[in-house]
Design a protein with these regions (language model features):
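Small-residue hinge/turn detector
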Residues: 67-78
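Glycosyltransferase-associated regions of secretory-pathway enzymes
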Residues: 1-66, 83-245
């Protein structure tokens, strides 16, 4: 069986919650059929990404990650996870979509195709078109782009012009499963509300959940122990992840 690959990218400050989430990703890599975690950093990027442009180092980390994710999934296939993903269980079912179909995407707020978590076979028409358009735009702009220019905006435009590229992809309505809280409500729903609020977030199918940068940033003043021993809605999901090992 071909090795199942999960790709991540991180540079800069190591936030405490990010460290916890990454440990969970690695721990679950031995669950089910297993997968290989490939954490790409500024130290090893040349091993995985070809033809890195001269302006890459001047791009903000979020845009660097956008560039990396398209390249590695197009070239190698696998699953891309943003580093603020909380893996709750085996990812076998997501890899099954890559093996039985072309892959999967998630709609943020059930409306916007999103690039934070997705999976694909290598070199599909969609991935090759996305990569081509991304490189063209970056070269024109010398890497100086808007927040979602090469992410959700680009894959949304491809959907409108070449919707057939998505025919063999599973598209999740995120609010119903993997992205149950829209980004602007994440701190309120996962951190601020009482612990029992987790009951409004759990879904029938939920091998992972999307968190956002506001969540790991607001917890940074706590120690890892304080985060793990907290009584916030997010603790239900962290504890469930450990239980599902």
């Amino acid at each position: 069986m071909e090795i199942r690959k999960v790709f991540l990218y991180w540079v800069g400050k190591e936030y405490k919650l990010i460290s916890i989430l990454r440990k969970l990703i690695y721990l679950h890599s031995t669950n089910g059929k297993g997968y290989k975690v490939i954490l790409i950093t500024d130290k090893n990027i040349n091993e995985y990404v070809k033809n890195i442009p001269s302006y890459f180092d001047n791009m903000i980390p979020a845009h660097q990650a956008d560039f990396v994710r398209v390249n590695v999934i197009c070239d190698y296939g696998g699953v891309w996870l943003d580093s603020d993903t909380l893996v709750l269980n085996s990812l076998d079912s997501l890899f099954d979509y890559i093996e039985s179909k072309d892959g999967f995407f998630i709609k943020e707020n059930n409306q916007i195709l999103w690039n934070g978590i997705f999976g694909s076979k290598p070199n599909t028409p969609l991935m090759m078109e996305w990569k081509k358009q991304m490189i063209t735009l970056l070269d024109i702009k010398f890497g100086k782009i808007g927040w979602s220019n090469i992410g959700s905006e680009m894959i949304g435009c491809i959907y409108k012009t070449n919707f057939e590229f998505y025919d063999n992809y599973k598209i999740f309505n995120g609010l119903d499963n993997l992205y149950p809280v829209n980004w602007h409500n994440c701190v309120t729903e996962y951190i601020d509300k009482p612990y029992e609020n987790y009951k409004t977030i759990i879904r029938g199918y939920q091998p992972l959940i999307v968190l956002v940068n506001s969540v790991y940033k607001i917890l940074e003043d706590k120690t890892e122990k304080e985060i793990l021993n907290g009584n916030m809605p997010i603790n239900y999901f962290i504890n469930k992840s450990f239980e599902n090992m």
